[in-house]
Structure formats: structure tokens, C-alpha cells
Amino acid sequence: MFATACPSNREAIYGMLATSPVKPQGVTASNGSAFMVAPGILITAAHCVHIETNPNKSVHNKFELIRAPDIGQKMESATLIAFDKKKDLALLKIDEPRSTACLKLLKATVPPGTPCGSLGFPLASVSFNPSGIGFNLIERFQGANISAFVVATDPIGNKISFYETDSLMYGGSSGCPGFIASGEVFGMNNRSAIEGTGDNPKESGAGNRTRLAISMWVTSMDIVAFASTNGVVL
């Protein structure tokens, strides 16, 4: 079902490496996926642009991106335009991108039961060595179904909305776009919920099987609104 959408969408999907110096002579890094939504403009998860992926810490000061078809080439430098910790969205800009291929964002909700897919760089790893930083990426597809479009109220009374899908994503999937069979994007993955049946999370076996495993997605409508607020019309 997604064999047609994946080759097209991968043209606009990137691995992101964010770094900052730490005393005395070290470097700290975060990583995630990102996708281009307008020429040179990319969306990723806000927590991925913060040190230790912690929204309560400072943002990194260096951002580099590599497009899926360009793996093995030199990474492209980007600047952070804006971020919204509540929505968990961030905008990055590449001044002179190698490619301007973009993904199309849906501007209406997708009904529950719709098959969906995701493409990006979960399970990526960063290594530090004398010659520099190694960023190890494998492009991965994941499939699921949309289980709910949730409208809720946060602890301070603000309305929030997000999608739920019915399968757990690989670790490190933040920033991956979620799309339907046409390739159009319904959201961006930013978190998952896992709940087991056992009392002791260290125990395994029938008494501690996972009984809840869902993934949550920032909606495409929120992405469009966030981009518009920051001068990017999608």
C-alpha cells in the first residue's frame, strides 16, 4: 500500500543532528528526524533541538541535516527559526538546500481506521571519536492505523489535539512524518505510551505483558498553523 508513497516521500525526509559544546572540551548531541514542508524549511520535534532532548534545557547551537537519498554525503547546515515547547514543534531552515522536494500536509482530519505509515531515522546513534562525530542512520518504514483523533484539555485549560495510532514506534522516532497511502502527511510523531500489566517493570513473562502501546502525533493542522505563525505559508 505504501510502496509508491515511500520512494516519493523519502526525497523530503532528513536525519537531524544537533550539537553543543560542553566544558571543558566536550560535545553533547541530540538527534531526530525532520521533513521539508517548504523550500529550505523543515519541521522536527521541539524536544529534539534541546540539549539532552529536554525542553527545560537550552537549545543546541548547531544543527546539521542529511536527506535520505544523500546519506554518505556531507551534511547540510541549518538554523533554528522557531520552536513551540507546548506543541513540540520546531522549524529549521537550510539556506541553500541541495533539494527543495517537500511533503504535502493535510488540512483536514483523517478518520480512525485509516492505514498510515511513517518514514525516517529511528534507532539512530551518535558516536564520538578523535576524528569527529559519527552519525549512524538507517532509514526505516513503520506501519499502523489511525485509532483516534483526540481533543483534550491540558492542566491549565488549553485545548489540545493529537492523533493516536495503534502500534508502538521504534525508539527515536520523534520528528518522523506520518502519512496516508497517498503520501500526504497527517502528523509528526513525538511520543509514545507504554503500560504493562505487571507490578514490577523489571519482571518479564505473562504477568508483565504490555497491555497498552500507542503512538501519538502532532497534527498536520497544528504544523500548518505553527508554520504560518512564523511566516511560512504551507
For each feature predicted by the language model, list its residue ranges.
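Short, structured beta-strand/loop micro-motifs enriched in basic residues and often containing a Trp
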Residues: 94-101
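Catalytic-histidine neighborhood of serine endopeptidases
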Residues: 29-31, 37-85, 121
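Short, small/polar residue-rich loop motifs at catalytic or cofactor-binding pockets
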Residues: 28-31, 170-174
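N-terminal activation segment of mature serine protease catalytic domains
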Residues: 1-35, 42, 79, 87-90, ...
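C-terminal subregion of chymotrypsin/trypsin-like serine protease catalytic domains
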Residues: 37, 179-234
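Terminal peptide-recognition signature
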Residues: 16, 34, 40, 44, ...
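Short peripheral tails and domain-boundary helices/loops at the edges of structured domains
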Residues: 68-70, 137-156, 211-213, 218-230
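Flexible, gly/ser-rich surface segments that form the specificity/activation loops bordering the active-site cleft
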Residues: 101-163, 168-173, 189-201
